[in-house]
Swiss-Prot record:
Annotated EC: 3.1.-.-, 5.6.2.5
Keywords: ATP-binding, GTP-binding, Hydrolase, Isomerase, Magnesium, Metal-binding, Nuclease, Nucleotide-binding, Toxin-antitoxin system
Sequence ranges assigned to domain PINc in this UniProt record: 5-132
One Gene Ontology term, aspect cellular component: plasma membrane
Keyword Nucleotide-binding attributed: yes
Family per similarity comment: In the N-terminal section; belongs to the PINc/VapC protein family.
Protein name: Protein PhoH2
Amino acid sequence: MTDTRTYVLDTSVLLSDPWACSRFAEHDVVVPLVVISELEAKRHHHELGWFARQALRLFDDLRLEHGRLDQPIPVGTQGGTLHVELNHTDPAVLPAGFRTDSNDSRILSCAANLAAEGKRVTLVSKDIPLRVKAAAVGLAADEYHAQDVVVSGWSGMHELETASADIDALFADGEIDLVEARDLPCHTGIRLLGGGSHALGRVNAHKRVQLVRGDREAFGLRGRSAEQRVALDLLLDESVGIVSLGGKAGTGKSALALCAGLEAVLERRTHRKVVVFRPLYAVGGQELGYLPGSESEKMGPWAQAVFDTLEGLASPAVLEEVLSRGMLEVLPLTHIRGRSLHDSFVIVDEAQSLERNVLLTVLSRLGTGSRVVLTHDIAQRDNLRVGRHDGVAAVIEKLKGHPLFAHITLLRSERSPIAALVTEMLEEITGPR
């Protein structure tokens, strides 16, 4: 029996990676015709349009090269093939409840009919519901893994035992050379312990350990935990262009980011304005477009979360001044396509719900003099197409150690004991996702 498998791809895979068809080694890749139609429908989508157009261009290039796509053509360098499947659409092979006119049913019919012919079929999708449906009709299904990274669980913090003399030197000189810290990623926060003394530092771009002072503040906010102090130190460092703040709900991610932004705009005047982008997903993955009202009315609940945080950090007079002078914008991510953000302190809130390509698009919009902060909690992904090993997690692993990038996972909850208790209970109930 041949080891060659047949992989049926759905639209979500090609929107995630337009070059996916060439990444299945020696195996056969099948794209149902309905996927081409779905790509066509996404050509002008505010976030996914570029990826849809790129995938369609690649199919057109293959058409020009090979003449037709309804028969297997070679792709990649390892003997794999690709074809667009026009047949195998008969839904009779599916259970009665799945014989609908939906695109999902058409994709399932294609995969099931190929499997009925004896092929070793796997349906590949980034869409959780479609993978569940495939399993329900007896088909093998898998997530698209070609873009996955091995998530190391890197928190951005490290603990080192050292001599008390090193700690004294760090306080005296503000920076020391520690052999044990040279192999740590750039901007890693370090808890130094030795001889009854302790200090907090971080690895700088020169692989030296610089002191993180506990009295640093941004717009009146000081870090309470070691992680928050390191995060604040990074947020106030203009040389770090991308700062990633992870952590559970209530650990202070948004507060730190907003205070750093207001400090940059109002106090230091290094940036013109703070721009907060939020993805258009509600709890459960509902897109904003399904809600009634104008765009501003739809954005109300999303923007209010930012204003609630600000109200706890600044007086009403300061908040009114910031808004009246246009120093703060809260926008849906749909507004970032085609923009170049110059001299802006950009905050991408709830970044865990963004697919990697969308997140990279956001980062590519940064213009001269701009910085970006990503706040995220991997456990609260509302976009069902984002897994634990892609999206912001993949970006962190790829950028880890670069002098322009820093990441810190915040651990201590700053909300009420009730909120902290409920967060822990929910994690115990749902388990890892």
